[in-house]
Swiss-Prot record:
Disulfide bonds join C91-C184. The keyword Signal applies. Gene3D superfamilies: 2.40.128.20. It comes from Mus musculus (Mouse). Contains a beta-barrel that binds various ligands in its interior. This is Alpha-1-acid glycoprotein 1. Belongs to the calycin superfamily. Lipocalin family. InterPro entries: A1A_glycop (IPR001500), Calycin (IPR012674), Lipocln_cytosolic_FA-bd_dom (IPR000566). GO terms for cellular component: extracellular space. Glycans are attached at N25, N34, N76, N94, N104. It is found in: Secreted. Residues 1-18 form the signal peptide. Functions as a transport protein in the blood stream. Binds various ligands in the interior of its beta-barrel domain. Appears to function in modulating the activity of the immune system during the acute-phase reaction. The gene is Orm1. The modification Pyrrolidone carboxylic acid is found at Q19.
Amino acid sequence: MALHTVLIILSLLPMLEAQNPEHANFTIGEPITNETLSWLSDKWFFMGAAFRKLEYRQAIQTMQSEFFYLTTNLINDTIELRESQTIGDQCVYNSTHLGFQRENGTFSKYEGGVETFAHLIVLRKHGAFMLAFDLKDEKKRGLSLYAKRPDITPELREVFQKAVTHVGMDESEIIFVDWKKDRCGQQEKKQLELGKETKKDPEEGQA
């Protein structure tokens, strides 16, 4: 996200308008269905963003990479967010819960007693989604991009670049993540391997 983290950005978000970046016209976010929620329940990689708002831009510049897991709860209409962010040579972990409103297609989060919202923009055929920020405010507008793979395809890059220019920003304002600087992925891989070894040991002892 970046998002100073997905968390920080959602905590700052006002009510937003979303667009379909693959078409010329703007539309209000589509309703969130169970199918969409199931699709969102996955591992996501922050790919890049273009922000006019200073807090958001500074957050991206201090972050080398970010990935996170979304786990939806259809009973409570909440989403568990578990986030891993590389800042410098350190890996920072965060977790929280997000709400969502099915009818207007928004995420929500309570922060400091205030509920804030973000419209979801799904790019399903690209395995990606976007969040839009203050599109009507020239000084605060922004777009961020997330995908299911860390390697952005030329087609998805072009879609995002066109979306950025369509909302009145310039391609030069886009900051893409350099996944070669990621540290959290390496740590996660080691933890998974350690977990597998831990499971093997008791079985070997019983053999």
